[in-house]
Amino acid sequence: MNGLFVSFEGVDGVGKTTQVERLRAYLEAQGRTVVVTREPGGTALGKAIRQLLLHGVDGGAVDIAPRAEALLFAADRAQHVAETIRPALERGEVVITDRYLDSSLAYQAGGRELTPEEIRSLSMWATNNLLPDRTYLLDMDPALSHHRLEHAEDRMESAGDDFQSRTRQAFLDLAAAEPNRFRVIDASQSIEAVWAAIESDIKELA
């Protein structure tokens, strides 16, 4: 059986984690072996990088330069693909990741003013050109999604409304550029309605 690689994208608070778990349960009920992971932080090295990216050094705020931030995300992604994603796909398993390279393109190129070409080139090099078979973009106005967050804001979430709006638009632009890979779903709907859209689509792939 062929491996299947699925990613979930969107600004914070749109409900990605809930839908990742729904999809995991559905596919496991179909008899598939499923690996659920996330970026940043899908490996031991990635967890250390995630802590640095989201919470700074020793819990203290740090202003990470945009190019340094891009390289940290790329390092996490390179390890993630080599250690977790590619081996699982080669075993014929399903990999579901909460964020992948599109987050770098949206948050760093769209939100932090690096060029998309720079970020995409770096990301594709880090992953050895591995793209998901399907990417679900859960789309919602950041002003609404922000109210859903139930934890203290990390460095990315506290970047401000303009940043989040630019990031949302960057995600939508990415989806428009790759319509065969992306499915854009209105995440302001109920959890059940969002899941129904995913379930209908995944049947074509799994």
Swiss-Prot record:
A GO CC term assigned to this protein in UniProt: cytosol
InterPro entries for the chain: P-loop_NTPase, Thymidylate_kin-like_dom, Thymidylate_kin_CS, Thymidylate_kinase
The keyword Cytoplasm is assigned to this record: no
EC code: 2.7.4.9
Entry keyword annotation includes Transferase: yes
Top-level taxon of origin: Bacteria
Residues noted as binding ATP in the record, renumbered to the chain: G10, V11, D12, G13, V14, G15, K16, T17
Catalytic activity: dTMP + ATP = dTDP + ADP
Gene Ontology molecular function: ATP binding; dTMP kinase activity
One matching Pfam family: Thymidylate_kin
GO biological process entries: dTDP biosynthetic process; dTTP biosynthetic process; dUDP biosynthetic process
Keywords annotated in UniProt: ATP-binding, Kinase, Nucleotide biosynthesis, Nucleotide-binding, Transferase
Entry similarity comment: Belongs to the thymidylate kinase family.
Stated role: Phosphorylation of dTMP to form dTDP in both de novo and salvage pathways of dTTP synthesis.
Protein's UniProt name: Thymidylate kinase
Protein source organism: Bifidobacterium longum (strain NCC 2705)
Organism lineage string: Bacteria, Bacillati, Actinomycetota, Actinomycetes, Bifidobacteriales
Name of the coding gene: tmk
